[in-house]
């Protein structure tokens, strides 16, 4: 078994392939996000499964119509992403589809009694909002002591070369997390370990400063019964629906941290008063129905059947 660190795209790709039959992908070249002519196979149906945001370097070849014309279909993981690519690159809509992300259904979800310290969790990369969360935690520590923020964050998921080149940029941030009251820094963890941690957590706290195209970590958290507190940046409103506490994005990170702290203070109080119980039941049922692989795999099979049939006609 491959135990090397994996990011969300790698996890989703692995989960998809494990649920498809060989015949589902017969004659299909499924390209993960990177837009480059070297990845095109002329004798196959070329599908770009696009997880990247429209502004990422590896997506910029979408400006090249020669590349776009060689791709048979583009699959986007949210309607937000589809529309951003449509606006920036004038993508051909007739070969564009939206198939949202998914996660395996959670079982044996156990939350500790909320009379103890509430367990908050952050599971994203450090540059997507950890510095804001750290500052918000420092602010919140001045007002209350009934919570604990567990941080699962590292540069490991992008490989050893990236870690060597960029990892030291975040050592100071990680050290501050380790030395901040009511923060517990875990660093890197496998997806299985992350899933166990979110199933035991009460709140998922993500003051995102990155335009997510979907956000697998949020899908996992909401499926596991965490109330999510995040920003309304990128595709997060689409991913979270009406279940999360949404903070209006603010480019001034100090002001964003203050805003996030204020919102989180209210959420903690409401959670202790059992104000989210009904919502969380609805939320878990919703994500089990609409964001589980039990549902999504049928959409993928239908899509792959469609593209193979079109090729034959």
What are these model-derived regions, one by one?
Residues 1-35:
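N-terminal pre-catalytic "stem/leader" segment of glycosyltransferase-like enzymes
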Residues 163-192:
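Nucleotide-activated donor-binding/catalytic signature segment of Leloir-type glycosyltransferases, i.e.
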Residues 112-129, 134-137, 141, 150:
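Conserved donor-binding/catalytic core segment of Leloir-type glycosyltransferases
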């Amino acid at each position: 078994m491959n135990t090397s660190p994996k990011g969300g795209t790698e996890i989703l790709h692995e989960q998809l392939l494990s649920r498809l039959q060989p015949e589902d992908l017969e004659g299909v070249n499924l390209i993960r996000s990177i837009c480059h002519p070297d990845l095109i196979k002329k004798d196959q149906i070329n599908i770009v499964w696009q997880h990247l945001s429209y502004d990422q370097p590896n997506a910029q070849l979408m400006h090249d119509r020669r590349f776009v014309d060689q791709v048979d279909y583009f699959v986007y993981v949210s309607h937000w992403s589809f529309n951003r690519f449509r606006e920036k690159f004038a993508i051909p809509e007739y070969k564009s589809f939206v198939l949202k992300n998914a996660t395996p259904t959670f079982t044996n979800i156990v939350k500790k009694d909320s009379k103890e310290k509430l367990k908050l969790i952050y599971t994203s990369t450090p540059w997507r909002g950890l510095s804001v969360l750290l500052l918000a935690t420092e602010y919140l520590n001045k007002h209350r002591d009934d919570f604990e923020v567990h941080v699962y964050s590292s540069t490991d998921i992008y490989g050893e070369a990236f870690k060597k080149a960029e990892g030291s940029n975040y050592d100071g941030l990680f050290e501050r997390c380790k030395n901040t009251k009511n923060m517990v820094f875990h660093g890197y963890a496998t997806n299985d370990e992350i899933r166990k941690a979110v199933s035991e957590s009460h709140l998922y706290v993500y003051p995102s400063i990155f335009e997510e195209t979907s956000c697998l970590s949020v899908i996992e958290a909401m499926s596991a019964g965490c109330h999510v507190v995040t920003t309304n940046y990128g595709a997060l409103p689409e991913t979270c629906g009406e279940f999360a506490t949404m903070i209006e994005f603010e480019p001034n990170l100090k002001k964003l941290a203050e805003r996030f702290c204020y919102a989180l203070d209210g959420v903690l109080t409401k959670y202790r008063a059992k104000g989210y119980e009904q919502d969380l039941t609805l939320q878990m049922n919703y994500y089990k129905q609409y964001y589980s692989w039990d549902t999504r795999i049928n959409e993928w099979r239908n899509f792959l059947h469609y593209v193979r049939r079109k090729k034959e006609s």
